[in-house]
């Protein structure tokens, strides 16, 4: 029963690193989340969001073409999928990035790589209660 509810959650994973993308998708699958769409940069994510609305966005900051901050700016300026929670997952240890991330409306968490999947699972569990 728990997995049925969990599987309803649509997750957009925005991550350019193929290995990290694969590992994160696999870990989310192991946690019962199977409705995951993965894209490699912010531009692909914006294109995806024009026709789709996920329940959660997991976002890397450092990507080619359109990075995470540019993605969030474009998303807000174009009022695309407002209210969809964003979990930032980044290798950037810069305090300025963490502070800048707090200025965006939908950012609910900032996690540093290597990703602590227990923390991500707790975030997903708390969100799942809101998504029912």
Could you say what each language-model-derived stretch is?
Residues 70, 82, 93-110, 122-126:
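Alpha4 helix (beta4-alpha4-beta5 surface) of REC/receiver domains from two-component response regulators
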Residues 60:
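Active-site residues of response regulator receiver
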Residues 38-47, 68:
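Helix N-cap/capping motif at the beta->alpha junctions
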Residues 18-37:
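Two-component/phosphorelay signaling modules centered on CheY-like receiver
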Residues 89-90:
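Hydrophobic/aromatic residues positioned on beta-strands within the core alpha/beta folds
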Residues 15:
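Conserved acidic carboxylate
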Residues 63:
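Receiver (REC) domain active-site loop signature in two-component systems and cognate sites
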Residues 1-10, 116-132:
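Non-catalytic signal-transmission and effector/linker regions of two-component phosphorelay proteins
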């Amino acid at each position: 029963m728990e997995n049925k509810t969990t599987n309803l959650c649509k997750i957009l994973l925005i991550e350019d690193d193929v290995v990290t993308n694969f590992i994160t998708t696999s870990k989310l699958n192991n946690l019962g989340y199977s409705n995951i769409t993965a894209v490699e940069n912010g531009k692909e994510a914006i294109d995806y969001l024009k026709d789709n609305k996920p329940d959660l966005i997991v976002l890397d900051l450092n990507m080619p073409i359109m990075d995470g901050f540019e993605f969030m700016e474009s998303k807000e300026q174009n009022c695309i999928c407002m209210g969809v929670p964003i979990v930032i997952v980044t290798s950037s240890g810069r305090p300025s990035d963490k502070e800048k991330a707090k200025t965006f409306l939908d950012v609910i968490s900032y996690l540093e790589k290597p990703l602590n999947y227990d923390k991500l699972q707790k975030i997903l569990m708390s969100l799942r209660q809101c998504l029912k």
